[in-house]
Curated annotation (Swiss-Prot):
Its main location: cytoplasm. Optimum temperature is 70-75 degrees Celsius. Highly thermostable. Retains 100% of its activity after 24 hours of incubation at 70 degrees Celsius. At 90 and 100 degrees Celsius, the enzyme shows a half-life of 15 and 5 minutes, respectively. This is Mevalonate kinase. Optimum pH is 8.0-8.5. Exhibits at least 60% of its optimal activity over a rather broad pH range, from 5 to 7. The gene is mvk. The active site is at 155 (proton acceptor). It catalyses: (R)-mevalonate + ATP = (R)-5-phosphomevalonate + ADP + H(+). It comes from Methanocaldococcus jannaschii (strain ATCC 43067 / DSM 2661 / JAL-1 / JCM 10045 / NBRC 100440) (Methanococcus jannaschii).
Amino acid sequence: MIIETPSKVILFGEHAVVYGYRAISMAIDLTSTIEIKETQEDEIILNLNDLNKSLGLNLNEIKNINPNNFGDFKYCLCAIKNTLDYLNIEPKTGFKINISSKIPISCGLGSSASITIGTIKAVSGFYNKELKDDEIAKLGYMVEKEIQGKASITDTSTITYKGILEIKNNKFRKIKGEFEEFLKNCKFLIVYAEKRKKKTAELVNEVAKIENKDEIFKEIDKVIDEALKIKNKEDFGKLMTKNHELLKKLNISTPKLDRIVDIGNRFGFGAKLTGAGGGGCVIILVNEEKEKELLKELNKEDVRIFNCRMMN
């Protein structure tokens, strides 16, 4: 069995969402792939293909492990353990899980959540148990909480339900209709500009010290109001850029991110950083008439470029 799960971007509202305002997230087709197969050994074998790492655990060990002691395997192991517990299954046959991912790590695209959700789906499917989306999302959220100490529903819910979500106060609603149809026809670039210099928690703490942050968040919320009504790429791109300018006022951008956003504005419809900031990724709304020039300019920078579209 092979499971493919998306990653996610924040289109609007990062940081504001911490303070009870809205964020708009989108599942994208930068995916991770989880393959699960039965084996003849009494073992659970995990292969992280991109890191060229493997781990084997005896079947009776899995229930008693602390996943946090297993480094790069921790999300996958926690997802296996919690799914088996939830389904009340004592594994009797061994299985092997192969994990591959196109998603750059530690840059706000939900790489760990993608692997977590994929593993939950793979393990439940392996035992012919069909979990509902709300069960999968809840299990995924609990894995992230167990590993990270605290978590937001944004990554696990967006990756489970796909499409477009409006997140507020750790709850969400799925956005359908004209807005979803409009975004289906948009082509984006994710540009991994630079390694993040600070962790999300540090950036959130720094934003907390900004005196006029509430005014900035209210402006971001107005941008979301406008964006949800728009049906043309030019205006949507301008709102992405406006959101970026507001994020700059929170001091979470960097000169490199600003440079990539500027290229995205000149040769695309618009651009913004996505995620916590302090480095990481920029999302650009592609103007296909200028795409060659856009790629030419981006390739002068030391960046990684990923084509993506909404995944539903």
